[in-house]
């Protein structure tokens, strides 16, 4: 995307910023080349790219948000809620490429920013993936923190202990790929890949600019993550 000056970006997170972000990204997506499998073959790697003409779906109503929160047993923090009320999700699905069992690149598709009404299976998989990723490192990479208590000798008991720890921690709400919004405390956006967890956005505005817009802007102050229950010990 085109480099933009800091003063062109609305300074506060709010509806004007989100409207600006929507217009800016849709303009860029209207001009980008349609991705092809050949693009990924030249790179020698899999991944996902935005399709030409990608657009935001538009926001959810209060009633729709209430139904979603009940269905998924979540509570969106204020900034995430406003994002869902103004922009919500992207369409069409992203063009993706991945390797098959014969190590050949094959075309696929995946959600961009999750649509909380249409992407239920993907969202539930993203929730489950948090625990599954941690358990992979528990079983294969010697992950077990002293603060978790004694390491059970039984695999089912280890799974139950990790699941209980995650259940007692602030929820991680899927927003895009393996990026998650912290549901309680500072509105951080975390990149979560197994137990490799980093801060990808110091707040939602910072995250959206980082993810979507090639721009120079003043980043918010670094957030002290050490006090975040459970996740703080894992954030690198």
Where do the language-model regions lie?
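Structured loops at beta-to-helix junctions and adjacent beta-edge loops in soluble globular domains
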Residues: 87, 176-178, 193-195, 202, ...
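Short alpha-helical interface patches
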Residues: 62-70, 204-215, 236
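Low-complexity, glycine/alanine/valine/leucine- and proline-rich hydrophobic stretches
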Residues: 183-215
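Short, well-ordered loop/turn elements at secondary-structure boundaries
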Residues: 167-171, 176, 184-186, 193-194
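A surface-exposed partner-binding patch
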Residues: 2-167, 173, 177
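Low-complexity, Gly/Ser/Thr/Pro-rich intrinsically disordered linker/tail segments
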Residues: 220-236
